[in-house]
Design a protein with these regions (language model features):
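Conserved AMP-binding/adenylation subdomain of ANL enzymes
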Residues: 1-34, 48
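AMP-binding/adenylate-forming catalytic core of the ANL superfamily
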Residues: 28, 35, 151, 156, ...
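Alpha-helix/helix-capping structural signal
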Residues: 40-43, 153
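Short, P/G- and charge-enriched loop/turn segments at secondary-structure junctions
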Residues: 109-115, 178-183
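Short coil-to-beta-strand transition motifs
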Residues: 115-122, 188
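Conserved ATP/PPi-binding loop(s) of AMP-dependent carboxylate-activating enzymes
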Residues: 120, 133-181, 219
Length: 243
């Protein structure tokens, strides 16, 4: 951020205190151009019924980044109807461990509700089946989100993994290999359940290690929570498998 000449604004505290639209107050007061929030935050303020476009200026705001969990189609709708019509909503997916995103926003391409726009620069991102075959020509068929090639911020390894001290990239430790390369040999597997769309966008269905598999049909937990949380009596939900 600083290398590009931008100024980072960090907020410490509850984003809904003392009022639900607190972050939009900060957007106006600090002239924020890019606002990074969680998908859960967008869903929470959507359910609270706030309308920032009616109560705030938001002239400086041109990008909203959403992360942490899949952003629902209803979340996309709320941003464009209740926040700002000409904002770039960038739903992103990556990891703290790699300090990067595998898939995310592209300001040169159209945005479709419920979809991440595509792979990020420098990332050979793909969704593959159990045999490592790409699913890009099978829109809607879900598989493992992977990166087929090394990327600039690939972690070198884990501390004290197989040897004392710093990791040796020439001799990766067993925990490191198990965490990222065991599921799909030769590819970095991030642990997300994803599918391509007909627009060559990506839909994240949830964590692949929490994917339910009744009768051989794989179902992402996010698909269930989205339906459950549409009920007015449900504020939040958690889905897990039970044998």
């Amino acid at each position: 951020v600083h290398a590009s000449g931008a100024t980072a604004v960090l907020f410490d505290g509850a984003p809904t205190m003392p009022n639900t639209d607190r972050l939009f107050d900060i957007v106006d007061s600090e002239k924020i151009s890019l606002l990074g929030v969680s998908a859960k935050y967008i869903d929470s303020v959507r359910k609270a019924g706030i309308e920032p476009r009616a109560s705030h200026n938001l002239q400086s705001l041109h990008t909203i980044c959403s992360t942490g969990s899949p952003l629902s189609p209803e979340g996309f709708d709320w941003v464009y109807t209740s926040v700002k019509q000409d904002v770039h909503l960038s739903s992103i997916s990556g990891g703290t461990d790699l300090c990067a995103c595998f898939v995310g926003g592209d300001p040169t391409r159209p945005i479709y509700r419920g979809e991440i726009q595509g792979p990020m620069l420098g990332m050979a991102s793909d969704a593959v089946d159990d045999k490592s075959n790409s699913l890009i020509d099978q829109p809607g068929v879900a598989g493992e989100l992977v990166c087929r090639q090394p990327f600039p911020s690939t972690p070198l390894g884990f501390w004290n993994d197989g040897r004392a001290g710093a990791p040796d990239p020439m001799q990766p430790g067993p925990k490191y290999l198990s965490a990222y390369f065991e599921r799909i040999p030769g590819m970095w597997a991030q642990g997300d359940f994803a599918s391509w769309t007909q627009h060559h966008g990506i839909v994240i269905h949830g964590r692949s290690d929490t994917t339910l598999n009744p009768g051989g049909v794989r179902i992402g937990t996010a698909e269930i929570t989205r339906v459950v949380e549409q009920h007015p009596g449900v504020l939040e939900s958690l889905v897990f498998g039970q044998e």
